[in-house]
Amino acid sequence: YVEPHLLRVKQYDMKFEQVAGNPITVVQFSDTHVGDFFTTEDLKKVVDKINEQQADLVLFTGDLMDNAAEYDGSIDEIATILSKIKATNGKYAVFGNRDYGGGAERFYEDLMESAGFEVLVNSSRTLEVKGTTISLFGADDALIGYYNSNKTMQGISNDHLNLLLIHEPDLISDFLSYPIDLATAGHSHGGQVYIPFYGPLLTTALAEDYVRG
């Protein structure tokens, strides 16, 4: 009831040999679970915070709504809010389990595309960002979707900066043989309830080994 409304930005400065020299800003957000406890007004605050980062790329790693079957708000309003996110070189997303459940599968991809996101479903996209060749690999949800790690990674190159989008973090074990430079995930909610120096009190399926990062 409290933590979803505590909006913080974690910044990580990383160096990769593939980067041509100009810094690249990538913003990831995930698990907004729009519904009774996280409203569209809360989502607007997330969008404002994202835009403050002046991102080159924005990545969403799934679970847009909490329960699509019970949501009585406007789907179009969510799309309109997400469309306000600015990214110089594009916005990309993958499915989470909540984006399949409750009937969300019927509209999630269309909603995200109308908001300017490209949804990656066991697929990839290669683009040039500030002189650096970046390949984005997006795996489908593994709990309810049609997850296929081998299909996702087709065509990967050691010469590119390779970014992976997955929803469930424990799936990373399926990608260890690939030259992934950065993996992004959601689903764990930081351990649901996390006690400092002790660890998570609650975990969820496919988010037990990698709870936070």
Could you describe each region identified by the protein language model?
Residues 152-164:
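Short beta-strand/loop segments at the ligand-binding rim of alpha/beta enzyme cores
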